[in-house]
Design a protein with these regions (language model features):
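Periplasmic peptidoglycan-binding/anchoring modules of Gram-negative envelope and division proteins
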Residues: 97, 101-135, 166, 170-176, ...
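Periplasmic OmpA-like peptidoglycan-binding domain that tethers envelope proteins to the cell wall
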Residues: 136-222
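Short, solvent-exposed beta-strand/turn patches at coil↔beta or beta↔helix junctions
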Residues: 82-115, 144-148
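Short beta-strand elements
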Residues: 73-86, 127-134, 184, 189
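Short terminal targeting/anchoring segments
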Residues: 1-78, 84
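Short, cationic low-complexity segments
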Residues: 228-244
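Solvent-exposed, polar/charged alpha-helical surfaces in well-ordered, non-transmembrane soluble domains
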Residues: 68, 110-117, 156-163
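Envelope-exposed proteins and targeting segments
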Residues: 85-87, 91-93, 100, 131-133, ...
Length: 244
């Protein structure tokens, strides 16, 4: 009357097969995930390092081109040289001072007022606007006398350079434009270094070369923002506070 009930028996292999993922399988999956994450992170770091190296190389290349332009300008003025290792414009004996003095002679005045506008033009080009941060007029003194006296004297020598640039030109000179003078005001700084970095001439047994000024070109670093220029009224540069 009743149909027989048939119970199907599972095979031995099927009965022993686990339902949940084993602990070893979980660890394997986590290890694979960890390796994938680490690979992605290492790839990102590698790309970042490579990008930084490319930016450094591009910066060095751009600055080298800028210094090439400054050298070309300096070549038109005998005695003016560019020290590429120190990013320095060296005027040689064209910007030497007498002992204990901070005044320049007329020929030195003319040289500065002729050469500096060429540097300003370079500062206005694409690479100059991109990398040139500021120009520091560095004054130096010979070791005769005490430190503080020479510190003040070296600062007066660097200040004299700016006074010369803002001074009325001689009748045979071309005047710097108001825009150029404003650029000098915004771009140039002065510094005095007393008798640090002295130069001794063994042949003449003198420190004449120590009594000098140099122009140091300072460049922006990678990612460094240019300091905002102060908002100042046009013109009205004032008068030189130095005597003579």
């Amino acid at each position: 009357m009743f149909a027989p009930i048939i119970v199907k028996r599972r095979s031995k292999d099927e009965a022993e097969k686990p339902f949940w993922i084993s602990y070893a399988d979980r660890m394997t999956a986590l290890m694979v995930l960890f390796l994938v994450v680490m690979s992605v992170a290492l790839l990102a770091v590698t790309r970042t390092v490579s990008q930084i190296e490319q930016e450094k190389a591009q910066r060095q290349e751009d600055i080298a081109k800028l210094l090439d332009e400054v050298e070309q300008a300096a070549d038109r003025y005998p005695g003016v040289k560019v020290d590429r290792d120190r990013d320095i414009i060296d005027f040689g004996d064209k910007a030497h001072f007498d002992k204990g003095r901070y005044s320049l002679n007329p020929d030195q005045d003319r040289l500065l007022r002729a050469f500096v506008p060429e540097v300003l033009a370079i500062a206005r080009n694409d690479l100059g606007r991109k990398w040139l941060k500021q120009i520091v007029v560095e004054g130096f003194a010979s070791p005769e006398g005490d430190y503080l006296y020479n510190l003040n004297l070296s600062l007066e020598r660097s200040q004299r350079v700016l006074c010369t640039l803002f001074a009325p030109p001689y009748s045979d000179e071309k005047s710097m434009t108001p825009a150029e003078l404003e650029q000098v005001r915004d771009l140039f700084l002065v510094g005095g270094y007393s008798f640090n970095a002295t130069k001794y001439d063994a042949a003449t047994r003198s420190y004449d070369e120590s009594r000098r000024v140099e122009l140091r070109l300072e460049f922006l670093g990678i990612g460094e923002a240019r300091p905002p220029a102060p908002v100042l009224a046009s013109g009205n540069f004032g008068k030189c506070a130095l005597r003579g």
